[in-house]
Each structure stands twice: as structure tokens, then as C-alpha cells.
């Protein structure tokens, strides 16, 4: 068994045996549940994601393009509707926020067009290290020369505009992990051979490595075996630390979920996935409890009506806006909440304004649109995987996770299902950096689909 003996002669590892035995039994139950979930998931996977890609003869995914165009246009319309009162009150120009957002949309469309025509996916793959390094440097720069707004330093001032590096980092992480897993996928899959006992043994070694030489040696051996995965993930973790310093807990959660999700798609075994998810959740709980304002948000989320004029003000007014919408809404422009009652109506809480003006029906249509985008992204990713375009597959799936988790969190906050956090609704909320890089990600989906279709027709795309 190879016990580790502490300096005082006590055999430490024996203390972990009862715990490990219980953990093994619990793990067996989890694995049985996971087998059922995999079978169900395979059925849903086949039903939703399998689709012919050349049956219509088109060279690109026209439905995806039109969905992005329509959602972006609707987002501009709702930004104007939600911000007209605020803009008129602040400076008298009721088109102020609409004009700024439209400028970023136009810039995003132009940049997307140029990149679509000029950069094949193999070019993107060569640029990944530079993009990731640039995003990391900008995360450092924002802490040095950033502009503080509402107590957070998240923006770099560029004249009259503000640039948010975190939005670039979200896309950079997807590209970086896609490149990493394409090259090192076998390392993750090799972890399947390690049992639960190895996990607990590795955990014990890590805990005791500071004081026990043998535990330190075994920890270093484990690190050397999986260094090709551990070191890059540590770089992503360092970026997450910089984001928490800003602080931006919402983006931290989104990027963490993207990373965990892509690890799972890359073949991380179920047992490690459960351990990783548990560790992440535990870490998030610690970060929430460490910041009084986050604790206050959680308390307000649990019972917003206890303090409707204080900590629960934003959430209660969001819920009232949604309630006023009823089935079919009050009509475009007829929202009452945007008239100074609901803070951030054109940014984080634009979904509540949409619900107020278009009702439950409008909410369902918008949620369907986001669900359609997520399924489309995973469908394109599956096609790339089937065609042997692994790098493309990871990018498409990562973008699907990004859209899905960020829209889920934003909508969840608006309807009172999640604590308040500062996240935009993709393609809808006011935010230049957000919409710019979301349009770039949509361009990547279209480019990946285009290369899928070319390969299906016999062209070489690598």
C-alpha cells in the first residue's frame, strides 16, 4: 500500500481509509445515475443535434444568420425602448444609448465580415496563443488604468467609449481550451484509468505535501503526468483571479462554467467531473460569504419583499414589471418600470422590460430563440466532430455553453430564480464590448458551419 509516515511516526494515510471506503460506495451510486443520464442524453443528442447539412444546397447556415440578425435588431429596439426615459433625463438626447449600441453593432458586423472572409479556422488556431495572451494582458491593464464604475474596475477608457476586457477573455478561453483539448485530449481520457482511491490518495498527498517529503514527491509525480493539462488550466485560473479582483463575479461564474463544460466535453471522466463541480461550488460559496455585499444579494434574493426599498429594490421591481406584462404585454414602449423605477433597465434587467412590454408570450419566444441558438451551436459542433474537425467542434460547443449559461443566468436573475449579478443578456442588453464579441462568436459559428459544408462536398479545409 505504501503508507506515508509523518515526522511524529503516525501513519497518516490510514486515517483516510474509512472515508475513502464510504466515498467509493457513494461514487458507485453516482456512476449508476450517470449511466442512466448518459443513455437519456444520447437519445436527446440524436434527436436534437443530428441533421443533414447539405440537403438545401446552401453554402452557409442561413437560418443561423437570420436568427442573429433578427435578435440583434430586436435588441437595438428594446435598448431604445428601455433607455429612452433615462437618456432624456440625463442629457436630452433620447437616442443616446441606441446610437452608441448601434455603433458597436455596426463595428461588430464589419469586423465579423472581414474575419469571416480573411481567416480560416486553421488561421484562428495559429492565432490562439496571441489572442489568449492579449486578453490576459488586458485583464492586468484594466486593474492598472481601468475606469471604476459602481465600485468595480472593469472598463478601459478609450476616449468616449469603454472597453471591457472580460468579454474578450470569454472568447479567448474558448479558443484556448479548444486548441488545448485538440492537442491533449488523450491526456484527459487517460485519467479514466485512475480510480476513486487514487483521487482520495492524491487529495491526501496534496494536503500533506507541505510537511511530508514522500507526499510531496507523489504530488509532483502526479503533476508531471498531467502537466500538459494542469498548467494551461492554471493559466485560465489566473485570469479568473484577475477577474475577481475587479470584481466581476458574474463573468467569473460564466467563464468557470465554460471551462468545466469544455473539460467534460473533452472527455473528463464522470468521477473527476463530479469532484471538479463540487470543488467549484464550494469555492463559489466561500467567495460569496467572503464579500458582505454578495451575502446581502443572496439574502435579498431569498426574500426580496422583506426590504423592497433597500436590498430587494431591484428584484422586486423586476418581478413587478414581469407581472404587469401578463400574457401579451403592455405594448412596445408602454413599460412603466423603465421610467426611473427599475435600475439598469437597459442593461442587466432588459429581460424584465421585454416581459413587461411583450408579456409571457414574448418571454417564451425569446427563451426559445436562445435555446435554438444553443442547440444550433452544439449541432454544428457535433458535425465538426463527425467530420474530424476537432478544433472547430470544441469552439462551437464552447460558444453554445457561453450563450446558454449567460442567458440562463441573466433570465434567472430577472425572474428571481437566481441572486442578482451583473451579466448582460446576449445580443439584447446595452453593452458595446458584450455585443461586439458575441457577434464575433456568431461569425465563428457561421465559419465553422461553412467549413463543415465544404468538407462534406469534398473540399479540403485543413
Swiss-Prot record:
Q: Which residues lie on this side of the membrane: Periplasmic?
A: 85-97, 147-160, 293-348, 410-424
Does the entry feature the keyword Membrane, yes or no?
yes
Instruction: Give the function comment from the record.
Output: Peptidoglycan polymerase that is essential for cell division.
Q: What name does the UniProt record give this protein? A: Probable peptidoglycan glycosyltransferase FtsW
Annotated coiled-coil segments of the chain: none
* Topological category with respect to the lipid bilayer: Multi-pass membrane protein
Q: Which terms does the UniProt entry file under GO BP?
A: cell wall organization; FtsZ-dependent cytokinesis; peptidoglycan biosynthetic process; regulation of cell shape
The taxonomy runs: Bacteria, Pseudomonadati, Pseudomonadota, Betaproteobacteria, Neisseriales
Parts of the chain on the Cytoplasmic side: 1-63, 119-125, 182-227, 270-271, 370-386, 446-462
A family per Pfam: FTSW_RODA_SPOVE
The catalytic activity, as recorded, is:
[GlcNAc-(1->4)-Mur2Ac(oyl-L-Ala-gamma-D-Glu-L-Lys-D-Ala-D-Ala)](n)-di-trans,octa-cis-undecaprenyl diphosphate + beta-D-GlcNAc-(1->4)-Mur2Ac(oyl-L-Ala-gamma-D-Glu-L-Lys-D-Ala-D-Ala)-di-trans,octa-cis-undecaprenyl diphosphate = [GlcNAc-(1->4)-Mur2Ac(oyl-L-Ala-gamma-D-Glu-L-Lys-D-Ala-D-Ala)](n+1)-di-trans,octa-cis-undecaprenyl diphosphate + di-trans,octa-cis-undecaprenyl diphosphate + H(+)
* UniProt similarity note: Belongs to the SEDS family. FtsW subfamily.
Q: Which UniProt keywords apply?
A: Cell cycle, Cell division, Cell inner membrane, Cell membrane, Cell shape, Cell wall biogenesis/degradation, Glycosyltransferase, Membrane, Peptidoglycan synthesis, Transferase, Transmembrane, Transmembrane helix
What do the Gene Ontology cellular component annotations say?
cell division site; plasma membrane
Q: Where in the cell is it found?
A: Cell inner membrane
Record-annotated membrane-spanning stretches: 64-84, 98-118, 126-146, 161-181, 228-248, 249-269, 272-292, 349-369, 387-409, 425-445
Query: Which pathway does the UniProt entry assign to this protein?
Result: Cell wall biogenesis; peptidoglycan biosynthesis
Ion transport as a keyword? Answer: no
* Known EC number: 2.4.99.28
- HAMAP family hit by this protein: PGT_FtsW_proteobact
Per UniProt, the enzyme's principal EC class comes to transferase
Query: What InterPro entries does the record tag this protein with?
Result: Cell_cycle_FtsW-rel_CS (IPR018365), FtsW (IPR013437), FtsW/RodA (IPR001182)
Sample GO molecular function, one term:
peptidoglycan glycosyltransferase activity
Amino acid at each position: 500500500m505504501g503508507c506515508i509516515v509523518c515526522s511524529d511516526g503516525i501513519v497518516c494515510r490510514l486515517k483516510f481509509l474509512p472515508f475513502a471506503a464510504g466515498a467509493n460506495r457513494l461514487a458507485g451510486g453516482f456512476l449508476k445515475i450517470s449511466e442512466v443520464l448518459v443513455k437519456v442524453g444520447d437519445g436527446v443528442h440524436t434527436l436534437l443535434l443530428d441533421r443533414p447539412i447539405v440537403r438545401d444546397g446552401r453554402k452557409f447556415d442561413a437560418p443561423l444568420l437570420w436568427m442573429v440578425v433578427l435578435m440583434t435588431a430586436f435588441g437595438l429596439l428594446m435598448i431604445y425602448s428601455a433607455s429612452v426615459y433615462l437618456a432624456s433625463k440625463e442629457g436630452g438626447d433620447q437616442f443616446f444609448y441606441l446610437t452608441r449600441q448601434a455603433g458597436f453593432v455596426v463595428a461588430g458586423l464589419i469586423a465579423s465580415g472581414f474575419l469571416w472572409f480573411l481567416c480560416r479556422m486553421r488561421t484562428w488556431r495559429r492565432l490562439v496563443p496571441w489572442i489568449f495572451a492579449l486578453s490576459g494582458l488586458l485583464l492586468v491593464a484594466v486593474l492598472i488604468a481601468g475606469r471604476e464604475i459602481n465600485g468595480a474596475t472593469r472598463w478601459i477608457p478609450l476616449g468616449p467609449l469603454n472597453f471591457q476586457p472580460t468579454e474578450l477573455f470569454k472568447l479567448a478561453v474558448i479558443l484556448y481550451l479548444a486548441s488545448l483539448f485538440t492537442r491533449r485530449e488523450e491526456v484527459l481520457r487517460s485519467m479514466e484509468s485512475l480510480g476513486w482511491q487514487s483521487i482520495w490518495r492524491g487529495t491526501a498527498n496534496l494536503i500533506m505535501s507541505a510537511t511530508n517529503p514522500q507526499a510531496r514527491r507523489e504530488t509532483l509525480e502526479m503533476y508531471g503526468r498531467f502537466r500538459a493539462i494542469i498548467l494551461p488550466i492554471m493559466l485560465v485560473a489566473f485570469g479568473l483571479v484577475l477577474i475577481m479582483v475587479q470584481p466581476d463575479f458574474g463573468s467569473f461564474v460564466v467563464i468557470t462554467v465554460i471551462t468545466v463544460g469544455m473539460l467534460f466535453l473533452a472527455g473528463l471522466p464522470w468521477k473527476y467531473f463530479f469532484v471538479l463541480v463540487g470543488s467549484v461550488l464550494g469555492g463559489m460559496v466561500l467567495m460569496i460569504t467572503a464579500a458582505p455585499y454578495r451575502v446581502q444579494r443572496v439574502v435579498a434574493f431569498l426574500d426580496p419583499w422583506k426590504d423592497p426599498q433597500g436590498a430587494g429594490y431591484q428584484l422586486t421591481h423586476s418581478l413587478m414589471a414581469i407581472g404587469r406584462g401578463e400574457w401579451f404585454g403592455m405594448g412596445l414602449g408602454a413599460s412603466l418600470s423603465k421610467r426611473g423605477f427599475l435600475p439598469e433597465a437597459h442593461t442587466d434587467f432588459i429581460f424584465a422590460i421585454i416581459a413587461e412590454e411583450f408579456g409571457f408570450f414574448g418571454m417564451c419566444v425569446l427563451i426559445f430563440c436562445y435555446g435554438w441558438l444553443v442547440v444550433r451551436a452544439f449541432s454544428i459542433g457535433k458535425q465538426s466532430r463527425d467530420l474530424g474537425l476537432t478544433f472547430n467542434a470544441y469552439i462551437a460547443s464552447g460558444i453554445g455553453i457561453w450563450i446558454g449559461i449567460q442567458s440562463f443566468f441573466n433570465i434567472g436573475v430577472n425572474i428571481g430564480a437566481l441572486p442578482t449579478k451583473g451579466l448582460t443578456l446576449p445580443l439584447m442588453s446595452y453593452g458595446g464590448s458584450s455585443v461586439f464579441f458575441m457577434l464575433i462568436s456568431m461569425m465563428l459559428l457561421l465559419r465553422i458551419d461553412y467549413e463543415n459544408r465544404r468538407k462534406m462536398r469534398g473540399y479540403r479545409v485543413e
